[in-house]
């Protein structure tokens, strides 16, 4: 009898533990929100107590009360309701819930938001008219409003590259949603294809390095027949479906090379092959700097929403063909507008970024900008006028992967001190 009783108590104990784990106080609160369509528990960083992948109902058109809806994916990593919240605005799909640098610095909770029209956050009927920075900012505002019911500490929004741009657009439309913004390597393009990119590529680094880049590009084009064969071999062996014919792809790779070289900073000037190197050496170097994926049908599909945004509102870049005109047979102008899907209508709104830029320069506050000095996107970085307390930090020689940890000494200390002052709290120094 006693054995049966002990067994029964053990079963109750196990059941109570299991129930408490699946029905934490946070989970109960999340389930009570009518805006949440789906919740799935996930593994998250060990410094967090709980982690969830959540689908949130959002209107396709926030300006229309009768709008159709879609579900937007977010990742929530929970530590403590009273701690700060780092609100990560992705520019594309969100495929991970890893803890960001900023969340470690602030010992913060974290929400990562997938951008509308990317990943799992795509409306059923793809209407490009509702892919705007304002509609995306409305998405973010709705999520902030919802989770501020739970998290009472300071809020900081942040993002990297296009995600950093998205951080700034969110702050522009809803300046009081967060206390501080930390956009990483976020360009503010002021034209459909911003000409400042050309000026940057003609002045970054040393003249010797820029000349070596150009000579490599010309050599790559000059060995067209051999390079084409190598490209075809890779396509066949890797079952790669390119978005264009082989000659167009190799020309496109050539034009993109200088932008990618400085953007990623993974190749040193001394590593660039000499013009008399074999076609195979030239080709392998090009692939390492310009992964073939970016020229495939799959990449065009994955990045289609970005190209729609770029050419309708947030801007992009083109190429200077003049150094290669005598070697090009497929590409007749330097525009990238051919990347936009045929289903999208292009009508560039030149005033959109002008308004954002003016606000960032004159009215914004508590924004910490992180840039890499050699990153091509630094060409169109925000230009502060000293009319607010925003801080722009540029890592000398830094590339598109520049972070707070990339800085040293007094520069890094200034970043930590500024964050601590704006948030009124002590911050971790990584």
Model-derived features: positions:
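Bacterial Sec-dependent N-terminal signal peptides
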Residues: 1-25, 201-212
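Alpha/beta-hydrolase
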Residues: 10, 169-306
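Catalytic-loop region of hydrolases
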Residues: 21-109, 408-410, 417-430
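N-terminal cap/lid subdomain of alpha/beta-hydrolase-fold enzymes
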Residues: 55, 61-135, 339, 345-366, ...
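Alpha/beta-hydrolase active-site loop
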Residues: 130-149
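Alpha/beta-hydrolase fold nucleophile elbow
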Residues: 151-161
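Gly/Ala-rich beta-loop-alpha elbow adjacent to hydrolase catalytic centers
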Residues: 159-163, 167, 171, 375
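C-terminal subdomain of alpha/beta-hydrolase-fold enzymes, centered on the catalytic histidine
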Residues: 263-430
């Amino acid at each position: 009898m006693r054995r049966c009783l002990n067994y029964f108590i053990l079963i109750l104990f196990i059941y109570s533990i299991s129930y408490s784990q699946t029905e934490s106080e946070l989970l109960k609160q999340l389930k009570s929100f009518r805006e949440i369509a789906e919740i799935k528990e996930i593994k998250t960083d060990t410094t967090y107590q709980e982690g969830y992948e959540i689908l949130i109902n959002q209107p396709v058109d926030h300006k229309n009360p009768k709008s159709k809806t879609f579900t937007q994916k977010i990742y929530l990593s929970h530590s403590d309701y009273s701690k700060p919240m780092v609100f990560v605005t992705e520019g594309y799909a969100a495929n991970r819930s890893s803890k960001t640098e900023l969340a470690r610095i602030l010992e913060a909770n974290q929400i990562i938001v997938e951008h509308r029209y990317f990943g799992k956050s795509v409306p059923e009927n793809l209407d490009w008219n509702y892919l705007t920075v304002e509609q995306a900012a409305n998405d973010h505002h709705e999520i902030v409003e919802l989770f501020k019911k739970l998290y009472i500490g300071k809020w900081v929004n942040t993002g990297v590259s296009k995600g950093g741009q998205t951080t700034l657009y969110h702050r522009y439309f809803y300046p009081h949603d967060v206390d501080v913004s930390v956009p990483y390597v976020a360009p503010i393009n002021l034209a459909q294809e911003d000409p400042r990119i050309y000026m940057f590529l003609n002045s970054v680094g040393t003249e010797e390095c820029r000349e070596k880049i150009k000579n490599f590009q010309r050599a790559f084009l000059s060995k067209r027949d051999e390079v084409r064969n190598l490209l075809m071999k890779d396509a066949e062996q890797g079952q790669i479906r390119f978005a264009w014919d082989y000659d167009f792809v190799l020309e496109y790779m050539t034009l993109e090379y200088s932008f990618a070289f400085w953007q990623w900073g993974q190749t040193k000037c001394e590593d660039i092959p000499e013009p008399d190197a074999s076609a195979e050496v030239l080709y392998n170097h090009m692939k390492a700097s310009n992964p073939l994926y970016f020229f495939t049908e799959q990449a065009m599909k994955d990045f289609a929403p970005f190209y729609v945004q770029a050419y309708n509102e947030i801007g992009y870049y083109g190429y200077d063909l003049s150094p290669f005109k005598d070697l090009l047979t497929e590409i007749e102008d330097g525009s990238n507008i051919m990347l936009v899907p045929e289903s999208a209508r292009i009508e560039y709104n030149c005033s959109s970024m002008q308004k954002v830029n003016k606000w960032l320069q004159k009215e914004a506050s508590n924004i910490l900008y992180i840039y890499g000095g050699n990153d091509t996107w630094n060409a169109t970085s925000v230009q502060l006028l000293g009319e607010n307390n925003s801080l722009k930090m540029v890592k000398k020689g830094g590339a598109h992967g520049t972070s707070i940890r990339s800085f040293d000494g007094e520069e890094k200390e200034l970043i930590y001190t500024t964050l601590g002052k704006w948030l009124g709290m002590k911050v971790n120094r990584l």
